[in-house]
Structures are given as C-alpha cells and as structure tokens.
C-alpha cells in the first residue's frame, strides 16, 4: 500500500485540529452566551462564533494589496486585513462604473487611504470623498445598545491627512461634520462606490438614503459594521433599507461586510 506523503498527512492533521477547535469554541460560545448575555436579546441570537475549513486566503498572495496594506500605520488600522481586502476588491469591481468614491466614517484614515491608493491605480480619474465628524460616533440611540455617542474620537483631520500622505494619496477630499445633516451638499453627483463605517442605526440608514439617488447602476455600498458584534444597530438598518428599495440587493462578504448593490434606477 502506497504511503501518504508527509505534506498530505500534515494537512489532514491541521484540518482535524481545526474541526476539533471549531467544535470546542462553538460549544463554549453556546454555554457562555446565556451567562454573559447581550444588551439586545434579539441581537444576541443573530451572532455566533465559528471557525471554517474554507481557509483560502487570496489577500495573502495578492502582492499589490499587500504592498499598500504593509504601508498603512498599524495604530490607525480599525478594520482587519480581510475587511480592507473587501474594499480593495470593491474598487477594482467598480472601475467601469461611472462615479466617484466616498467614505462615511473615516476615523484615522486607514481605509480612506486604501480606497485612494486603489482608485489611483485602477480608476485614476475618480475622486475620493471622506466624511467624518472627527469628534467620534454620532446619532447613537436605543437601537445601538453598546454606544452612547462620542466613541472613537481619538482622531483629527491632521492624523488623516498624514496617513493619506504616507500612502501617496493625492485624490482625496475631507468633509467635516455629521453626514448627511452637515455635509449633504458635498455628496458626489455620481457615486460608483461608498464605504459606510459609522457604527449606529441612524447614521447608517440616513447615509444610505442620502447617497442612493446619486449611486450609478452597478454601484456598491460596503457597510463594514454589518457583521460586527458591537454595532448591532447596523444590520437592521441595512436590511430595512434593502427591503424598502426594489433596486437594491444585499450580499455578505467574507470579511463580514454587508455589500449593497444598485441593480437599476
């Protein structure tokens, strides 16, 4: 009988270890969830810790993505590597869609720098628009049990501009204030891609409602907080918006982002 190659044996060991770890962690989560609890009983049923055997990780071997990812300052990285790869691929996917790129919720500028870098590479004629209060989370309500407002205020316009300069991004504009109440008029006339990272129900749905009319057919709106266990107001906001608009479809990315796409006028 032919012996199994060592590398294949090693792979089987890793897969079995992953399966054991998954069972252990999922069991621990099921036991611990009722004990720890969650501010929202409804939300607690919608979140689950899991491991997967689908371990293909194209972002690890995408040299162009890794080049810009490694130049981003670690202190400013709010999103994980996989979520940033979602944005990277989104810029590439809308390169033939008419319209600029915008981000609501810039924080310290990491994702805005990635969007700017990618757009300069794949869609050099598009402008990048960043919207932020620079004073923390806005419009927290009873729909956001883990937020009171003002979180993530450890940023400034200067910090963001320095991050943009470090990534050699020259096509970005910053707009300061609560979007859309304070800066609605700065919304691009045509939008091919929007990234919404605002943590709360009201900020999410108001941003979607305002920019949707300017979104081109085929445009993507990436809602990073959709899968976050802390921003529990975001999924119902995104889902309500999609349910209310026949020309919107919703997808869920490997990075946990909710991706809304416009399929018709």
Describe the function of each predicted region:
Residues 82-86:
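N-terminal pre-P-loop "Q-motif" helix
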Residues 1-74:
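Membrane-proximal basic amphipathic "stem/tether" segments
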Residues 54, 58-78, 88, 95-265:
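S-adenosylmethionine/decaboxylated-SAM
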């Amino acid at each position: 009988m032919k012996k199994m190659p060592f590398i294949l044996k090693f792979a089987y060991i890793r897969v079995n270890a992953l399966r054991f770890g998954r069972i252990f962690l999922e069991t621990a989560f099921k036991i611990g969830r009722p004990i720890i609890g969650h501010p929202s009983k409804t939300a607690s049923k919608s979140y689950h810790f899991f491991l997967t055997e689908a371990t293909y990780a194209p972002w690890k071997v995408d040299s162009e993505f890794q080049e810009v990812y490694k130049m981003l300052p670690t202190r400013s990285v709010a999103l994980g590597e996989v979520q940033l790869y979602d944005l990277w691929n989104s810029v590439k996917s809308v390169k033939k869609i008419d319209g600029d790129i915008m981000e609501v919720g810039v924080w310290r500028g990491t994702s805005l720098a990635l969007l700017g870098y990618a757009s300069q590479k794949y869609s050099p004629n598009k402008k990048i628009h960043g919207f932020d209060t620079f004073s923390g989370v806005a419009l927290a309500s009873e729909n956001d049990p883990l937020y009171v407002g003002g979180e993530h205020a450890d940023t400034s316009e200067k910090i963001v501009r320095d991050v943009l300069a470090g990534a050699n991004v020259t096509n970005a504009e910053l707009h300061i204030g609560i979007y859309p109440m304070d800066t609605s008029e700065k919304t691009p006339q045509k939008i091919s891609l929007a990234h919404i990272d605002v943590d709360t129900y009201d900020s999410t749905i108001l941003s979607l409602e305002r920019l949707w009319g300017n979104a081109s057919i085929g445009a993507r709106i990436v809602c990073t907080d959709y899968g976050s266990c802390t921003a529990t107001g975001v999924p119902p906001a995104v889902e309500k918006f999609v349910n209310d608009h026949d020309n919107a479809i919703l997808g869920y990315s490997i990075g946990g982002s909710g991706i809304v796409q416009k399929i018709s006028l």
